[in-house]
Amino acid sequence: MSLSDKDKAAVKALWSKIAKSADVIGNDAVSRMIVVYPQTKTYFAHWPDLTPGSTNIKAHGKKVMGGIALAVSKIDDLKAGLSDLSEQHAFKLRVDPANFKILNHCIMVVISSMFPKDFTPEAHISLDKFLSAVALALAEKYR
């Protein structure tokens, strides 16, 4: 699935509005993922505290949203722009790529609840396509 110029512009416009809240979005999205999809806890078993908003959850949420920020900046070539992250998730972290879709959904739920006026139907579809493209780029090294 490729992103149209309209999709790219919509993602960049939405990101410009939400970027300053990225850490909160990341914390809430990772917290939501851990609670709603408890099978994802297996990747974080080494953390002493998996409760929503814990120090580890906040730190990981910040990393996740840093990756999203990187993806927005590399939106014209996500495969190359996210190559290092793909390699890390495939070979070091060994994350099942199906979990990218789960986290993407949680990110969209949080953004839609925090920014309801900005999360228009057009922004929704463009962000969904973008996050799907990010997940595909992150899964690249699994092949």
UniProtKB/Swiss-Prot annotation:
The modification N-acetylserine is found at residue 2. O2 binds at residue 60. Red blood cells. Keywords: Acetylation, Heme, Iron, Metal-binding, Oxygen transport, Transport. Heme b binds at residue 89. GO terms for biological process: hydrogen peroxide catabolic process. One of its GO terms (molecular function) is heme binding. Residues 2-143 form the Globin domain. GO terms for cellular component: blood microparticle; haptoglobin-hemoglobin complex; hemoglobin complex. Gene3D superfamilies: Globins. Signal peptide: none annotated. Heterotetramer of two alpha chains and two beta chains. Belongs to the globin family. Involved in oxygen transport from the lung to the various peripheral tissues. This is Hemoglobin subunit alpha. It comes from Artedidraco orianae. The lineage of its organism: Eukaryota, Metazoa, Chordata, Craniata, Vertebrata. The gene is hba.
